[in-house]
């Protein structure tokens, strides 16, 4: 089994290192990840300047681009084969609800899915430094082996969120839906010493809606959340409504 790993926290992030070490039990591991943090870059693809990939270890490349760039370079250039699975993570911080649209971690898995490769995004629900990623890494190994054995539905990838708890306190995984979040007061408006305004998009409390069956509902109760996401963003329930508009 050939496994491509990436992330958005950077190639030297402890979550990625823990994942790479754990995944060796399944086969050959290749790491192609950003050379610096690329959190919240979404599905950005670099088109207006060249990319560089530096080999910094055995089967380890640091790319001066986004997680999506890393998957592209890996599959189309740096690797001489198509990986059996792409695993993105382990992200330091949750990727729940609407936040998946911002996530470089999730977008890397989405990019692999666009290329027809099974993919998983894995996040640890924490913001703390020095976090222990072992439990999340072991679950990722188990899930990757299952995906390899059973496959995934077409155009589907898995978004995994693991609560930051001692392994013995983590409750069984649940298949969940993508949750919802309330966004309020995220812009910090300040004036610099020269009298010019500047703005900072700051972090806020999670403010997730506690919807039964959702990703947040699961992790807030100590469960691992596994959410199947897919590429088709069409809102099929709205098609009939729009067709009634007079402009069509």
Curated annotation (Swiss-Prot):
KW Transmembrane (keyword) present: no
Cofactor (UniProt): a divalent metal cation
E.C. no: 3.1.3.5
Subcellular location: Cytoplasm
Keywords from the named record: Cytoplasm, Hydrolase, Metal-binding, Nucleotide-binding
One annotated Gene Ontology cellular component of this protein: cytoplasm
Pfam families per the UniProt record, alphabetical: SurE
Cofactor note: Binds 1 divalent metal cation per subunit.
InterPro entries, alphabetized: SurE, SurE-like_Pase/nucleotidase, SurE-like_sf
Catalytic reaction annotation: a ribonucleoside 5'-phosphate + H2O = a ribonucleoside + phosphate
Domain of life per record: Bacteria
Residues bound to a divalent metal cation: 8-9, 39, 91
Gene3D superfamilies in the cross-refs: Survival protein SurE-like phosphatase/nucleotidase (3.40.1210.10)
Reported function: Nucleotidase that shows phosphatase activity on nucleoside 5'-monophosphates.
Family: Belongs to the SurE nucleotidase family.
Cited PANTHER family: 5'-NUCLEOTIDASE SURE (PTHR30457), 5'_3'-NUCLEOTIDASE SURE (PTHR30457:SF12)
HAMAP family hit by this protein: SurE
Name of this chain's protein: 5'-nucleotidase SurE
Lineage of the organism: Bacteria, Pseudomonadati, Thermodesulfobacteriota, Desulfuromonadia, Geobacterales
